[in-house]
Amino acid sequence: MRILFLAAIIALSTAAVLAQQPQKPTASEIYHKLEKLNFLGSALYVAAHPDDENTRLISYLANDMHAKTAYLSLTRGDGGQNLIGPEIRELLGVIRTQELLAARASDGGEQLFTRANDFGYSKHPDETLEIWNKDAVLSDVVRAIRTFKPDVIINRFNHRNPGSTHGHHTASAMLSFEAFDLVGDATKFPETAITHGSWQPKRLLFNTSWWFYGSKEKFEKADKSNLVSVETGNYYPALGLSNGEIASLSRSMHKSQGFGSTGTRGKQTEYLEFLKGEFPQDTTNIFDGINTSWSRIEGGVAIGKILNPLLDSFNFQDPSTIVPQLVEAYRLLKDTKQGHWRSIKLKELEELIVACSGVFLEAVANKESINPMGAYTLKVEAINRGANKITLSKITTASGLILSSKEIVLLSNEKENLELEVTSQNKVPSTAYWLKSKGTLGMYSAPKDLIGLPQTPAAEQISFTLNIDNTALQILKDVVYKFNDPVDGEVYRPFNVLPKVSASIAEKVLVFADENSQKVAVHVRAGKDNLEVTLQLNAPKGWVVSSPQLFTLERQGETSTLWFTVTPPKNQSQGYLRPLIQIGDTYYDKELINIDY
């Protein structure tokens, strides 16, 4: 038997709609953000896969405690099923990454990853850690903790029962348990200690339940003196939802796994077993003994005196009345020493000032994609829908290139539109950063500065400088593409950098039962207008492929199908078939995959 596999190098486009739509918070949502502003505490939830996370507890931490909350999923779920489409393995991991981001957008958490690959079911954590490369994944867990700097770490799974469940599950808990003692030691994984600083969380907890005890009856009889218990069924009037309803909305984002969930209301208790660190005196408070007030920042007491009273004086009819106090707090915070919470709260203050002011900023490209180093027209909309005096003083690219330095006073409810010509500095096409380089069965490869990020940063970003009450704010916005659909109305899409041309073969595996030739169709897509293209197929030694073909693609987006005759060798053989496109002296070998659900 003779077998050919398609060798595909991917340029990936995903319709990450949630990430592209502009935020337009209501007064109630602004109030909720204000509550979060005055809490300086954080929690990191750790498990193995997308859908392993306890969305009820994550939502409770983010919306009830108002803590900065993140879920560290060691893998992207590449080994799971797919209920909604044909994508599996790496492409399923891309889908499940977006599902996790949608879940966090629902429950208020953030999302982190390691480079570990979900290679399928594993019977034992020893097998898992061998395939993953334990030290590499452990270093990623340490990196995540040092970057996020959680006060509390919560494991989803039990680290003490290897072999009793999925090896990935137990391994995630084992790595978190080990990392807790390493992150505070700058000599352990020193590279991330230099970059992000060492850090020591206050406590490590295990999110236990009756399931881990074997039955509800056994759990009722168990000694609970080592457990923290929290009531997670609370109702949030500002959001109009109970915590269980938010959790179900989040859970239902795992659509590829068929995890749609119905909302619940009423009391729901979560239990957390104390594992390491400082035991809380108040076993109903996860953050007991942790300073979560503004005094956590040097000079923060004065800031807290300005911000804490704003919850009582907040005007739901006119949130802009608190803008002067927010700006005053922003100025004071800018004058404090560089630090972890300073950066977080400056960003939150910027978002609140913009939201309370009724400012809308948007940067829209005139086309959905460009080629590397390509040019596009940027359509800017800026409007101040409140009563505060605001000036738009500068617009730059994220790298600092000035696009407009014209000072524009944003008069109340008077829209300003600008058209700016931009040349991208992006030299490579958009794709999932963990798929750019070949990894192993257990580990993806990733640039060091991107390890842990949920997705590749936006291809193009624009910085707006706003001046409010003699205070400059830098507001960063992703460049997006949008259009009007006759059915859906305003539709947003990511703005991507795509190759000039791409090729694909629909059949990823070709089987030759004998020595007879087969016809192979290659689909070529133009990434720009007026291309003269030569296409050839590279095959392993001994295989014979018909001659390269020269053809023209006139319009961007145009697709042409070309047929090649492939003849196998007489003896058994297998290898990779690779489409290669030549334009002038440049060769292209990427396949463009668009995922849109």
Language-model regions: role of each:
Residues 454-528, 595-597:
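Acidic, serine/threonine- and proline-rich intrinsically disordered appendage/tail regions
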Residues 372-373, 411-417, 512-517, 554-559:
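Solvent-exposed, conformationally flexible loop/turn segments
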Residues 20-189, 210-211:
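Active-site beta-strand->loop->alpha-helix modules in alpha/beta enzyme cores, enriched
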Residues 330-373, 400, 482-513:
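Low-complexity, acidic Ser/Thr/Pro/Gly-rich terminal tails and inter-domain linkers that flank the onset
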Residues 421-454, 553-556, 567-573:
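Short, surface-exposed loop/turn segments at beta-strand-coil junctions that are enriched for proline
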Residues 372-387, 515-529:
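Short beta-strand elements of extracellular/lumenal beta-sandwich folds
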Residues 383-417, 421-426, 527, 531-556, ...:
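Proline-anchored loop/turn motifs at beta-strand termini and strand-loop-strand connectors
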Residues 21-22, 29, 182-360:
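The feature marks non-catalytic terminal segments
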